[in-house]
Amino acid sequence: MLHSVNSNNNNNIIKLNIGGFKYITTRETLILNSSFFNGLLNSDCGTVIDSKGYYFIDRDGELFSPILSFMRTGTFTLPYRMSLNNVYREVDFYGVDRLSALIQHKINISNITSVAGGIYFISKLPLTSNNNNIIINNSNNNNRKILHAVIKANIMALYFNDGYLEIWMQGMSFQWVKILTHLCFSNEYHIKELTARILKNDLNETTSFSLAARTSTERKVLIWFIDLDYHHMKVKIKERDITINHDIDYFHFLISNSFLACISMYGLITIVDLADQINLVSNNNQINQNNQINQNNQNNQNNQNNQNNNFKVIILEDRVSGIANSNESSLFIACSNSKVYELKQNIKRNWEWSIDEIYKLYDPEFFHNTFGFSLTNNNNNITNNNTNINNNNNPNSIYGNENNNNNNNQQNIINEIINKRRIRNNNNCSPLVTCLNSSIITNGGRLKSVLVLGTDDGVVHFLYKSVRDNMDRFYFASTYTLCNEGDDPISKVLISGGEEGVFINAISTSGISKSWHFIFNKQQQRVTGNSVYTGSSTKCIGCISLSSISNSNNLFNNNDNNDDNSFSINDIINNNNNYFNIFKFKNQKDLHFTSNSNNQKENNQYNLDGNFKFSSYNQIKVVIDQSNNLLVFAGSHRNAICALDYELPSTPILIIPLMDKTKVQRILISTFGGCEPTIHDQSFQLLTFHQSNQIYSWSLKEINHYFISTTETILNNDNFLNNINNINNNNNNNNINNNNNTIVKKRSGSSPLISALNNSILNSNNNNNNDNNPINNYDH
C-alpha cells in the first residue's frame, strides 16, 4: 500500500524501488551526486513510500544499476547489451551531471567518424626489451621487430627478430599480459611462418597451446607445447626441432595436436607423430609479465638427435595449391590437377592415414550421389604409407639414417618427383584451385560439411556433403563468378552458415569482393516448423570494390599460418596488393569474433522469441583505407528467415580511426573462450600490428546492431504489408506452393505476422526460376 509521508528522515539508509527493481544505499551517495535525489530527500514536499519503506520511482529500474554504481565508485561501466543512449536519458532525469558529461563525451566519440578509435580502443600492449624491462617506444624500437604473430582463443604468440618467442594471454578480468619469454634454439633458424592450435577443458579454458614454426631452412620445423595451469598460475613448455626430408610449404596440427602434417607444394606429405617428439625444457615456471627461460641449446639438440622419429609419408599425384580444414581430424588438400583430397585417419584400416579424392572440378561424376572412390586402393598414388624413420632397410624410403649409403638414392627419388611435377604443372591447362575454406553447419536438423573453392579463372565453387553419410566425396551445389572469367583469380574465400542457409564470401586479386546466400532444398521454415520442398535458391547479396579503397601504406597480407590465413597462393595475395583484407566470423549470440568454426554443433543455433532461428556466425571484412581508418564491412546479415529479398550494405558498418598513423602490417582476432565458440565466450577483440612495432586492441562488441536483419527488411516491404492484409481476410488454413505443388499448413492460432512471414517465404520461392537440382544454380 502506497501512502504520502514527510521526507524528513534522519535514517542514513535509503531504500529505493525503481520500476520494480529494489536498491539500498546511503543518503550521502544519492544527494552528493544527483540533483534529483537531493531534492527528493531534503525537500519538505511529500514523497511516495510503500509499506516496507521503499521510495517508489516510476522509471526503468534496470537502467538505474550502472548509474548507482557510478555514484558509489566514480567509475562507469556499461553493462552487456545495455544501450548507452537509454542510460543517458536516465542520467539526465536523475541529474547526475558528472556522469552525464562523461556519457555525452562517449556518445560524441562513438560516432562513425570518431577520432583515435573512440570507445572501441581498449589497450596498447606494453612490449618490452628482453635485455631489460624498459618499455619499447617509437624512439628505441628500431632494433627489435615483430616478425610473426598468431592467435588462438585468448593466447597469442609473437616472434621477434632477436630470436625470442613471447606468449601473451588475455583473461576475462584483465587485458593482455605476457606469461612467457623464450629464446628459440638458434639464430640460424629464421622462422618464416607460425601455426597454432589449442585444447580446452570442460570449463572452456585454454589448457594447452601448441605452436609450430616453419624455418628458413625449408626442411626444419620447430615445435613448442605449452601447458597452462590457471589454478597454480604456472606454465610448462616443451620444445623439439624436427627435420623433414622435403621442403615444407604448408603444415597443420591434427588429432588434438598429436600429429603435424608437413606438406610440400610438389605433393610430398609427411605426418609426424608428436607423442615422442618433444623435449621437456621447464616443469615449474611461474607465470608473470617478464618471465624469461634460460636453456642450453646444445644439450637440447643433442637430446633431439638421440630420439627416434615416427613419420608417415604419402605422395600425391600432383602439385599442392592449398589446404583447409573443417575439423581437427582431417585436412582438405587442393591440387593443380583440379582435384581435392582429404587427409585423415581411416577407422577401417586400423587408424592408418589415408588420402581420398573427394572432388574434381567440372567432373559430372560429382554432380550426383555415387559410391565413393578412395585413392588408398591405388598403390601408384600412395606409397610408403607405413614408413617409419627407424626402418632403414626400405630402399624406397625417403627417410633414413644420415650415414646410410642409400641417402643419395633417397634424395634422387625426391628430385625425380619434383621434376615430374614441374613439367606436369607447366603443361596443365585445367583450372587451378587457388584457395579453399570449409566449415560444418547445421541445416534442417542435420550436420553438413560445406566446402568452397576459388580458382585462378575467377570462379567460386560451392560443395557440400552430409556428415552422417558414410561417404567421402563432396557434391556440387553451385558456382559463382566475381567478374570477367579468367582475368581475375580468386585470392580468398570464406564459408559459414546455419539454418537460414550458407554464406559465401570471395575476394579477387583485383579487389572485387562478393557475398552470396545459398539456401538448400527441403528447407524447414523458421516460422512454422514445417519442411517445404522449395528447391535450392541462391543470390548475390553484396558486392564491393576494395581496390577503390586505396591505401598509401601499401599493406601486405599476413601469411602467418592460422586457420583463415594459411593458404597457398602467396604470390597472388602479395602481388600488387594495395589493400589489406581478412575474413572472420562474428558470433551473433555471444558477440565475439572467432577463427573459422571447425566443430559447430546443433546447440549453436538459438531461438529468438520462439519463432526464429539464426546462425551463430556472421561474416565481416576488415580493410584499412588511405587515411588509416579501419573499415568494417558486413559479409552476412544479422538474422534471417528463408527469403532472399535483401542486400548487404555497400558502405562500411563501422569506421574506426586508428591512433597509430604508421602502416598496419597485420590484423588478428582474439576471443576469450577459444577458436570454437560456446555460450561461455564473452569477449572479442581485433588487434592491429603497426610498423611502429606497436600493438593496439579494439573492442567490436558494439557492431552487432549495425548488421541488417532480413526480418526487418521484410517488415518494411510494401508487398509484405499487403500480404498481412490479404492473410487477415483469408480464412483458408492452407497455402499452396505452386512451384512444387507442396501444401503447407499453418499452425492453428498463428498471428498475422507469422502468417505473413510464411507467405513471404513462399512468394520468394515462387519467384525463383531455379529448379530443385542444385546443378542449375549459377550466379554470374
From Swiss-Prot:
One of its GO terms (biological process) is protein homooligomerization. Residues 10-80 form the BTB domain. Coiled coil: none annotated. Signal peptide: none annotated. PROSITE patterns: BTB. Transmembrane segments: none annotated. This is Uncharacterized protein DDB_G0287347. It comes from Dictyostelium discoideum (Social amoeba).
